[in-house]
Design a protein with these regions (language model features):
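TM-loop-TM module centered on a large, flexible mid-protein loop between adjacent transmembrane helices
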Residues: 68-72, 241-291, 298, 307, ...
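Selective recognition of specific alpha-helical transmembrane segments in multi-pass small-molecule
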Residues: 52, 56, 154-166, 200, ...
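Membrane-interface loop-to-helix entry segments
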Residues: 136-166, 340-352, 372-378
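Membrane-water interface regions at transmembrane-helix termini and the short interhelical loops
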Residues: 62-70, 129-151, 214-217, 326-339, ...
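C-terminal membrane-solvent junction of multi-pass transporters and transport-like membrane proteins
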Residues: 352-421, 432-433
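Hydrophobic, membrane-embedded alpha-helices of multi-pass small-molecule transporters
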Residues: 10-20, 165-172, 181-245, 278-290, ...
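Hydrophobic alpha-helical segments and their helix-loop junctions in multi-pass secondary transporters
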Residues: 92, 96, 156-181, 198-199, ...
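Helix-loop-helix connectors at the membrane interface of multi-pass transporters/channels
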Residues: 31, 101-121, 213-214, 294-320
Length: 433
């Protein structure tokens, strides 16, 4: 089936909706508020990682078929554990509950300030929020109709209203904070790395492929090609929205310096330009952005676990994850974050390595590349995480701290490159022997 421009636009909007959650909303304005006059070089670095990694991730997982098949190139045991940890950590263990708690904070700030019954309101909000998200997620092959046609255009319109208000109240950018004064591109690159959206790309890849099939595509090559085009299109849209949010942050940071986070940066400008209506506008932006991401995560996680345990129906998995997320978002989010964030920090380097390997020759050509690079990066990532937790001997910790980019959280990079070279070299030697 030949896709029309309308179909492609719907898929681009759908992919954008899946990625653009609360974190994506607050990172760029906070970066700009900090970077001040160096906002644009910092945003160039930010977009390289915050846009580039997710696009490459979508293309990588659709090339492989799904995350399980991609991980199986390392080892069957690796494929049994790695995707499970990814889905649990980024799903009910972190991102799904946080969509409700983060958006509720903005709703409470706009409409419930001073209320003595915030816990009760939060419970009611989370029940409604996850009920709506769960109902939308019940048909994963129809996300283009719900996200692409309705929720994403609504989100873009709301962000556009905030951006126009910023243009009507211009203010010069402030001075750059110390971290952005000398190497703003590198600092922006590191900030984009911290979004960890590449993990979401591996999770969303299968849902994107499912929606392409629902639009009439059946051949694997056609699905890979269209997923790549949709990923690039969504990446361009992400970049444009990030730049708009960065301008908002630059203006807000110049007018009201000292904000502690991106939500505060946005709140100061929205309240100044639109008053109470501005806070309602900002709350609506957060709710729609978080709802979009929640739908995508519920659908992706339920699809994965239904494939692994088909005796439990897909709707049952959606309901289970929604109910778990209601509980965590109300009573245990900080505790679950304490567990999930280290797990994500452990897995993120491996995610980036798998994405890179997906574009290199297949395992038949370099049979030792995936196992050595995958297991080696896992070992390096675990050692670095243990060092930061203070559980390694002092001598070993001191040795790890001399690795390049250790302080920036990229200490795994040099060991990873060594393991990649080792895997490729040993594979070539094995072929010659």
């Amino acid at each position: 089936m030949k896709r029309t421009a309308h179909h492609r636009l719907l898929m681009i909007l759908t992919v954008f909706s899946l990625f653009f959650g609360a974190g994506n909303l607050i990172f760029p304005p906070f970066l700009a508020a900090q970077a001040g006059q160096n906002t644009w070089p910092a945003m160039a670095g930010f977009c390289l990682t915050a846009v580039g990694f997710p696009v490459l991730g979508v293309m990588a997982v659709t090339r492989a078929g799904d995350l399980h098949r991609l991980a199986a190139r390392v080892h069957p045991a690796f494929a049994a554990v790695f995707p499970l940890l990814i889905y649990l950590a980024i799903g009910p263990g972190l991102a799904i509950p946080r969509t409700a708690s983060t958006s509720f904070e903005m709703v409470a700030q706009a409409a419930l300030e001073g209320s003595t019954r915030l816990p009760l309101w939060q419970l009611a909000y989370s029940l409604v929020f996850f009920a709506v998200a769960g109902l939308i997620a019940l048909k994963p092959d129809a996300l283009t109709q719900r996200l692409g046609k309705i929720l994403c255009p609504l989100l873009l319109a709301l962000i556009g209203a905030l951006f126009v208000g910023c243009l009507l109240a211009p203010h010069p950018y402030g001075a750059a904070a110390e971290a952005y004064q000398t190497h703003p591109v590198i600092q922006g690159f590191l900030d984009g790395y911290q979004t960890m959206d590449a993990i979401a790309a591996l999770v969303f890849g299968s849902v994107i492929a499912l929606n392409l099939r629902a639009l009439g595509l059946t051949e694997a090559h056609a699905i890979r090609t269209e997923a790549a085009l949709d990923g690039v299109g969504a990446g361009v849209l992400l970049g444009v929205v990030y730049l708009c949010l960065a301008h908002i942050g630059g203006v807000s940071g110049g007018a009201w310096p000292g904000a502690k986070n991106g939500a505060q940066v946005l709140s100061q400008l929205a309240g100044s330009v639109y008053g109470r209506c501005g806070m309602a506008l900002l709350a609506a932006i957060f709710v729609v952005a978080c709802l979009n991401t929640c739908v995508g995560l519920l659908s992706s996680c339920a699809s994965y676990f239904h494939q692994r345990l088909p005796k439990v129906s897909y709707p049952a998995w959606v309901a289970l994850f929604a109910l778990i997320s209601v509980g965590i978002s109300n009573v245990g989010l900080n505790q679950i974050l304490a567990l999930s964030v280290p797990v994500l920090n452990l897995l993120y380097p491996i995610v980036l390595v798998l994405i890179l390997l997906a574009y290199l020759p297949k395992t038949e050509t370099l049979p030792l590349l995936y196992p050595i690079a995958g297991w080696g990066t896992l070992a390096a990532s675990a050692a670095l995480l243990a060092a930061k937790a203070g559980v390694l001997p002092a001598a070993l910790t001191d040795g790890l701290q001399v690795l390049p980019l250790y302080a920036q959280g990229l200490g795994w990079l040099c060991p990873c490159l060594v393991f990649l070279a080792l895997g490729a070299g040993l594979s070539l030697l094995k072929q010659r022997a």
